[in-house]
Amino acid sequence: VYVSGQVPMVGGVLAETGAVGEGEGFVSPERAKELAAVCALNALAAVKSVVGDLDRVERVVKVVGFVASDPSFTGQPGVINGASELFGDVFGDAGRHARSAVGVVALPLGAPVEVEVIVHVRD
């Protein structure tokens, strides 16, 4: 199952907006990591809506994370760890995956983080 990019929506509302960076006026890397976990939860909800039961997930194949970043920010992998750690918590070894973490200028709706996922499911 290929899940399109998920942003940190909670109750239909974007949980936070802005670029990730250090200092005032930016989303902190710690907060962005939490938001990446929210993106991962939203991705799991999308998978469940298609396959009916998350027990059908054999493994998480790949995660691609995008982080709207201040030009001097280079901690994108640490931010996307929020998603990776959640998949590990939910699926154990089956949650281990290939991953990319990319810094970008902006994301849809002003989101600080976006996560897309590929999972392999049983028939």
Segments the model singles out, each with a brief description of its role:
Residues V1-D123:
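Short, polar/acidic, helix-capping and beta-turn segments at strand->helix junctions
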